[in-house]
Amino acid sequence: MPSTPESDPTQPGDRPARPALRPLTPVEGRVLGVLVEKQHTVPDTYPLSLNALASGCNQKTARAPVMNVSEAEILEAIDGLKSLSLVFEGSSSRVPRFEHNMQRALGIPSQSVALLALLLLRGPQTAAELRLNTARLHSFADISSVEAFLDELASQTPPRVVRLPRAPGARENRWMHLLSGEAGAAVAAEESARNTDGDAAPSAELEQLRTEQQALAEKVARLQGLVEHMAAQLGISADEFLG
């Protein structure tokens, strides 16, 4: 029998249909992804203050696209996410702090939450890239495990992710989230079509570039985690620490 989201199952299972959410705005998607990420990478400072949330939304690494949003825009996004029960504001601190409610609101396990967060933060990725990039949020046993949770998200009503057509020279399909609605899927489909019209790069060269990119991303993620931990110990944001 399927487990409830709170039981954090290790394997996906069939789940009842959930009410369709309105499409998220780009800033709402970024805020939601950051809250999920920081819950795992800087648990000592989670739930996040507005300042920490702004720092996470605007950080230059592990983000695609890089954004530059104001605190006013973030507060507007938080209000929108609150109306969808995706974000709560804590009441136990004089400084407002915010936490996500993605697992309960969407009725999905934490593994799926991690995958959606990385798709929100970094855009379309292959299952292999997602396994690497979610390492600090959840350790998937293998790529097949990642694909199983992605397949479940894709089969939900409404679907939460979609598998994109394979790009020229690529060995794997990329996945993208559908939390921003069908419009986001259309943009990704057009991008894929443009790639298909171009000259295909040699498979070996493309695979080498992907390998190097993944290795670099892993190093950057480790460094980012170290910076965030040190900044948290000093009681400042990561940007202030680096500045």
Swiss-Prot record:
Region of interest (Disordered), residue spans: 1-23
Pfam families assigned to the protein according to its UniProt record, in alphabetical order: DUF480 (PF04337)
Gene3D superfamilies: Winged helix-like DNA-binding domain superfamily/Winged helix DNA-binding domain
Family matches, as InterPro entries: DUF480 (IPR007432), WH-like_DNA-bd_sf (IPR036388), WH_DNA-bd_sf (IPR036390)
Ranges of biased composition (kind: Polar residues): 1-10
Family, per entry: Belongs to the UPF0502 family.
PANTHER family, per database record: UPF0502 PROTEIN YCEH
Name assigned to this protein: UPF0502 protein RALTA_B0914
Species: Cupriavidus taiwanensis (strain DSM 17343 / BCRC 17206 / CCUG 44338 / CIP 107171 / LMG 19424 / R1)
